Amino acid sequence: MAGMAAAAAALVAAKRCMNAACGAPAPSPAGGEWRKGWPLRSGGFAVLCDKCGLAYEQLVFCDIFHQKESGWRDCSFCGKRLHCGCIASKNSFDLLDSGGVQCVTCIKNSAVQSVPSPVVPKLFSSQNNQRLFGKSDDLLSGRPLETSSLMVDARNDDLTIIAKNNLPFMVKNVEAGQSSNILRQKELENGARQIKWELPTLSIGDMGRIPFLTRSQSALESRRDENKDPTTESTTSESLSEACLNMSLGIASNGNKLEATSTVERPMLSPTTGFPEGRELTTALSPFQHAQRARHFLTRPPRVGEGAVFDPTKDMLPHLRVARPPAEGRGRNQLLPRYWPRITDQELQQISGDSNSTIVPLFEKVLSASDAGRIGRLVLPKACAEAYFPPISQPEGRPLTIQDAKGKEWHFQFRFWPNNNSRMYVLEGVTPCIQSLQLQAGDTVTFSRIEPGGKLVMGFRKATNTVSLPDSQISAIANGSILGDTLFSSTNENLAIVSGYSGFLQSIKGAADLHTSSIYDHHVNSADGDVSWLKTDKFGSRPDEGSLQFLKRGRNIGSKSRRLSMDAEEAWELKLYWDEVQELLRPAPTAKPTVVMIEDYEIEEYDEPPVFAKRSIFTIRSTGEQDQWIQCDDCSKWRRLPLNVIVASKWTCADNTIDSKSCSCSAPEELTPKELHIVLQQYEDMRRRRNSFGFKQNIPEMDAVSLDAFATAAVYGDVGNQGSPSVATTTKHPRHRPGCTCIVCIQPPSGKGPKHNPACTCNVCMTVRRRFKTLMMRKKQRQSEREEAEASKKIAWMNRDEPEGSSLSRSPQTVDTTRDGDVTMFDKVDINKGHIDLNFHPTAVRDEERHGGQPRVSMVSLLEVANRPLENYMKQNGLTSLAGEQGSSSTCTGAATVPQPALVESEERTSNNDGGRVATAEQPESMAVDEAGDNQPDKAAGDSAAALA
């Protein structure tokens, strides 16, 4: 351990500062620590002492230790001395393509002050863009640029890209009478250089066409310096400044005349380097900053004069529909762009006729199915109705007279419906007008106003395939927040797909001295309305305001793609349905199936995966034998094979090892051309029926109407006249694709199409039969359960009443012998009058009466009789008092045990007060005796009280 510590101490002692001018040893623990220096070629970093490392971190290492060494150069922009031949200063400067050097401070300043331009055309590589001012040394030193480095191509008006001596420039032909925004370098008395921007007057003439659209940027014009010497102007050259062409699609005050203007601008400054108007540009930006800002250049378009009109577009775009902003009205700013009128000048002229009146387009609406139907009601957009139609306060509305394009007046009822705290405005009675104009769903109705007079006019436009500008882009154009690159890409794309002008852009490219984007630098005067590009940004506004919002809102994402509808039978034949694919899946030859029963269906299960077989046609002979027919891949002849043979996906006649006569392609075909035609035709008909209706048939069930009936045709004659029945078009419910085989799609409409055979075995019929069978079984089961429940209830009542009745009739009772002669009779209640007795059996009563027996009385009837008032009992029996019965009964002595007499049915004696018939039953003697024996004192008191009453 002592040896290792000594070695470590020796290593630390040998470690010194790598600065040759310093060479300090390892610092003491209290003196400081080592610092990292420049990266070494062998890896790692140089080891410096605290003093040298601090100088290296502050970028003054060479200024302190290498002042007398060679390799020093000045920064091309700030003039700082840089030690270019030292590894310690390797990361403190950068080399310019033109041969100069640039310090790291200038690099950082340029990165902070430069504003990224997302719409800069990718004309040059990033390396060239960063070194755009290749001759910055000449600019700073005051030497003019050599004219030999600018090569102007005078053969066309387009810009020519020059890259000479690693100096890319964009130069356009400068002709007589044409001026440009130039960058002038002027020398002051102290020898310093200033860069001033001037905005000379642009003359009207043949202007060069700029093939690029630039982003929106505000135009600022700086004043001339009064202290400048006009005689010190140096040679002028074309500047590479940022410029902009503010464009907006709009309509002028006169409604038709449009103009194109462009604004020449100076380089855009970051918010931190902005300066007020009149301040010298060099006080805010250094010469290096000017050079760095120039790499974010945008080509400056020329100003188009009043006489410069782009004539070819008149012929190329005669039917371009551009949405016009709506006229003045209540709430016009709330109108959606889809309601803006896209009416052309020709249509306006047709409406106005030869009169001097002015037609003001208001809005338009695409007719829906309900609008064009027989309801006679046209739903109006709420904002449009409130803005341009007369105000109404009652739901009944008011009559409204509107003139059509032919001059005929129509009378409608303009009203509204309250709807969720809002209103839905409608025009009622529009059916005659729509029928007269022969309008359908999808057509467009336009509403305009005739000035003076304010009369409403209704025009129309038939539905076509014309593609208009998207609503999002129209709204962005109207709001004025539009970018050049977005408009260039999206509008060009829309113009290229205008109906009837698909080759519009290609024709412009092929025209002489024209560029693709030149249509944006000139008027587009068409019959649909003039199109112009107007500047929208105000003086001094920031160019990036609202750009991000517009990029999100105005991005052209194309029209909404909808699901492709394939209704044609030819298109259906291109698809392989799942049942057709299953025909190609066959079990492996060595696989043995396991049969499983699921819902009365036998399903074969295999442990091995299926194999792909060749498509074949299965037939049934007149004898009942089944065959399959395979087509050879070489000779295209059809060969007969047994049903159980599995054919590979690629099969030839040489693979036929079963039939030796057909094992060669030279062997004749077994089918005649007529039979083959019948087989193939019926096979296609079967496939079409199966695809349309989900028709499924098992192979053993195919008959003469099936796809392969040539054997039957040979026995019964020609079956060519046996055409398949016509198949009606199915009514598919929504969200189901063509070829759907659900139970709704495969059935024909109600009352249409062929009827199914009662013995049909299709999927629908089998499903219906299975469901009907299940329903009938459930119905019978419920009925039997109900009958069993009723029978069990009856048996329970009978078992409960039977011991009670038998005890009354069979049990011996102790009776008083003195009352044998007096038998109290109760009326039997007629249970068929007003009540339903569940224990009443008419058949049993008839049987008892037939055999001389007496019917049995239930406990319910006895309880009802016992609950009757005593007065009714006395009236029914003709008794006025119970004293006589009581006295006579008292003379009888002794008691005897006698059987209870049976209950007998008595005749109807009296009727109650309300006229109802009442039947009575004779009371058993035991009950009377029981009451007399058990409660004799109480009954005597009760009888005496009744007698007194």
UniProtKB/Swiss-Prot annotation:
Regions of compositional bias (Basic and acidic residues) in chain numbering: 221-231, 782-803
Region feature Disordered, mapped onto this chain: 218-240, 777-820, 881-949
Residues within the DNA-binding region(s): 363-464
Entries under SMART domains matching the protein: B3 (SM01019)
The keyword Metal-binding is assigned to this record: yes
InterPro entries xref list: B3_DNA-bd, DNA-bd_pseudobarrel_sf, Znf_CW
Family matches, as Pfam families: B3 (PF02362), zf-CW (PF07496)
UniProt feature, compositional bias: Polar residues: 806-816
Binding of Zn(2+), residues: C632, C635, C653, C665
Zinc finger (CW-type): 623-673
Gene Ontology terms, MF aspect: DNA binding; zinc ion binding
GO cellular component: nucleus
Major localization listed first in the record, in broad terms: nucleus
Keyword Glycoprotein: no
Top-level taxon of origin: Eukaryota
Alphabetic keyword roster: DNA-binding, Metal-binding, Nucleus, Transcription, Transcription regulation, Zinc, Zinc-finger
Cellular localisation: Nucleus
Protein name from the UniProt record: B3 domain-containing protein Os07g0679700
Organism the protein comes from: Oryza sativa subsp. japonica
